[in-house]
Amino acid sequence: MTLLKNKKQLLEKQYIKKNTKKFNQVILALFSGGFATFSILYCVQSILPMFSKQFYLTPAESSLALSAATITMSLGMLFTGPLSDIIGRKSIMSTSLFIAAMLTMICSMMTSWISIVLLRALTGLALSGVVAVAMTYISEEIHPNSLSFCMGLYISGNTIGGFLGRLLSSILAEKFSWSISLMVIGLFSFISSCFFLYFLPPSKNFLSVSINFHKCLHRFYLQLKNRVLFFLFIIGFILMGSFVTIFNYIGYRLMLEPFFLCQSSIGLLSTIYLTGVYSSPKAGVLINKYNRNNILIVSLMLMIIGLFITQYNQLFIIILGLIIFSGGFFASHSTASSWVGSYSNIAKIQATSLYLFFYYLGSSVFGTFGGFFWFHMQWLGISVFIITMLFFGVFLSFKLKQKNFKNKYF
């Protein structure tokens, strides 16, 4: 009876199927949106030393240009998600993209550090309207058979956006100035936002609801109480925390003996992020064949293997280890995020918002806490810390595999 009911619901909903014109439009739109979002978010990372030099800042103070945006973005996702339940998915994503692009261009004209940090905080808040809602749009509008593949392509767009944002801003800042680099990133993002607005089909399976604060909190509570979703939230926390920590401190290692790499050479390590362009959609395809749980476990193990490989003091082998680690990370994130979207039958936006909240929270917590291990044991300490957390992620994945575990609450 339940199976017949689920089939009837699938027929009633107007899902977008793979290999159709609308599906291709969704891919182009979400790719453009992901590119704009993460190029704006990470464009300042490569020019933090320039901020330090111009405004006489310590590295910690300079990092506020990035951390101010990520903090407000993670917090904003808890509110912009439910807000989209009222005004619609496409409306809030389009508005958020245009606001973020405009704020980035305005930021390029600022001459005081406080103004830059404030504008970056507002930019992060605006971007939360895209990050929190895009995954929900995909899970609502894309046919379940194509959901994982589409989610993987969306994450690929995010990956390319983050990579090009870092690379382009670095080149333009060195050639001209940091303000020119931000202006160009803002203009490119504005154009990408236009593509997003034009190509993204309006929601067909979305029903507008009024905000009830108590009901909204209750929905968040239900998602946290659900064991499957809660474990996926923790896995997301571990994933992003591990990824950011490794790339935060690998530069310090490669500046030391026996490598002595310069800053520009270390900056090229961001090209490793492009492994996500392949591994994210590939994981989506493999999920339909081997199921999500198996793909998640294998992807986490790839991260662990990659990190073990980086223990060798040969540059080529370290880079190989980072490539394997990154490929496993993007495959894991694509798998876990699509799992959250498909598993949460009710309050999808709250489930997605919580996953992304934990995901970016892991970046802040691990990135800072990793400094303790670097100070005492350098790269070995970082590796032991991250490998331990990844094994905990594998443990949670095996717990999710237990048949008697499904659909249970704490």
Swiss-Prot record:
Q: Tell whether Cell membrane is among the UniProt keywords.
A: yes
The record's principal subcellular location, in a coarse class, is membrane
Topology in the lipid bilayer: Multi-pass membrane protein
Q: TM segments?
A: 27-47, 63-83, 97-117, 118-138, 145-165, 180-200, 228-248, 254-274, 293-313, 316-332, 355-375, 378-398
Q: Which GO cellular component terms are attached?
A: plasma membrane
What Gene Ontology molecular function terms does this protein carry? transmembrane transporter activity
InterPro entries per the UniProt record, alphabetical: MFS, MFS_dom, MFS_trans_sf, Sugar_transporter_CS
Lineage, top-rank taxon, reads Bacteria
- CDD domains in the record, alphabetically? MFS_NepI_like (cd17324)
Q: Which family does it belong to?
A: Belongs to the major facilitator superfamily.
Q: What is this protein called?
A: Uncharacterized transporter BU588
From which organism does this entry originate?
A: Buchnera aphidicola subsp. Acyrthosiphon pisum (strain APS)
